[in-house]
């Protein structure tokens, strides 16, 4: 029976692809996802639990035989159970993972690397979210390994509160990134004060 587990199994960065090896993952019908859209930064009406973060996100995918986004989505469906970071910032991590995987990957040896650097404004519903000044340095490897395939996700997310002008984060329901957020069970609600604001509930 297939199951998810965290194991120590390093990807070999030094391996060089053989001639003729594709420089991008194999095509799947749900592989290439367009980046989500952002609404322009507007005056936030509700001032409680608003945090401005400078985000750095990177996901390295190691899969010697290529990988399917269906496997990644299956892995992310168990994200709540394997997440090892700060629980007050799990919502931010889920948002960043969705955004990172919406970008185009850069081949790196046997791996594909997705990166994101952005300043985003998050707003949490009452009693949720990080403490004032709280930051996140999250790094984890999550691995799918069965008799047929091996896929390793090396996730790194850095979130530091900053004062650089950013964009207000809001779910675009027409974006395929919503598939990933739905898979991870991202908990949000629309702000009653601002229709362009998605409040995080975790």
Swiss-Prot record:
Listed Gene3D superfamilies: Rhabdovirus matrix protein M2 (3.10.460.20)
Entry GO CC: host cell endomembrane system; membrane; viral envelope; virion membrane
ATP-binding among keywords: no
Keyword Membrane: yes
Source taxon at top rank: Viruses
Subcellular location: Virion membrane; Host endomembrane system
Keyword line: Apoptosis, Host membrane, Host-virus interaction, Membrane, Viral budding, Viral budding via the host ESCRT complexes, Viral envelope protein, Viral matrix protein, Viral release from host cell, Virion
Signal peptide: none
Listed GO MF terms: structural constituent of virion
Residue interval(s) of motif PPXY motif: 35-38
Region of interest (Disordered), residue spans: 13-32
GO BP: any one term: viral budding via host ESCRT complex
Topology within the bilayer: Peripheral membrane protein
Purpose of the protein: Plays a major role in assembly and budding of virion. Completely covers the ribonucleoprotein coil and keep it in condensed bullet-shaped form. Inhibits viral transcription and stimulates replication. Plays a major role in early induction of TRAIL-mediated apoptosis in infected neurons.
Oligomer status and interactors: Homomultimer. Interacts with nucleoprotein and with the cytoplasmic domain of glycoprotein.
Domain-related comment: Late-budding domains (L domains) are short sequence motifs essential for viral particle budding. They recruit proteins of the host ESCRT machinery (Endosomal Sorting Complex Required for Transport) or ESCRT-associated proteins. Matrix protein contains one L domain: a PPXY motif which potentially interacts with the WW domain 3 of NEDD4 E3 ubiquitin ligase (Potential).
Family: Belongs to the lyssavirus matrix protein family.
Anything else known: Most abundant protein in the virion.
Protein name as it appears in the record: Matrix protein
Naturally occurring in which organism (per UniProt): Lagos bat virus
Gene: M
């Amino acid at each position: 029976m297939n199951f998810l587990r965290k194991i120590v199994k390093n990807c070999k960065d030094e391996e060089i692809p053989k001639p003729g090896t594709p420089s991008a993952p194999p095509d799947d019908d749900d592989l290439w996802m367009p980046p989500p859209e952002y609404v322009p930064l507007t005056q936030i009406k509700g001032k409680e639990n608003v945090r401005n973060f400078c985000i750095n996100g990177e996901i390295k995918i190691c899969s010697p035989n290529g990988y399917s986004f269906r496997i990644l989505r299956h892995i992310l469906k168990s994200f709540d159970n394997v997440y090892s970071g700060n629980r007050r910032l799990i919502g931010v991590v889920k948002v960043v993972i969705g955004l990172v995987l919406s970008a185009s990957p850069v081949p790196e040896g046997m791996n594909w690397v997705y990166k994101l650097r952005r300043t985003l404004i998050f707003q949490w519903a009452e009693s949720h979210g990080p403490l004032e000044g709280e930051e996140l340095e999250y790094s984890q490897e999550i691995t799918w390994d069965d008799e047929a395939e091996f896929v390793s996700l090396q996730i790194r997310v850095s979130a530091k509160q900053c004062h650089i002008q950013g964009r207000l984060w809001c779910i675009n329901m027409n974006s395929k990134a919503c598939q990933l957020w739905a898979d991870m069970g991202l908990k949000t609600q629309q702000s009653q004060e601002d229709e362009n604001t998605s409040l995080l509930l975790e």
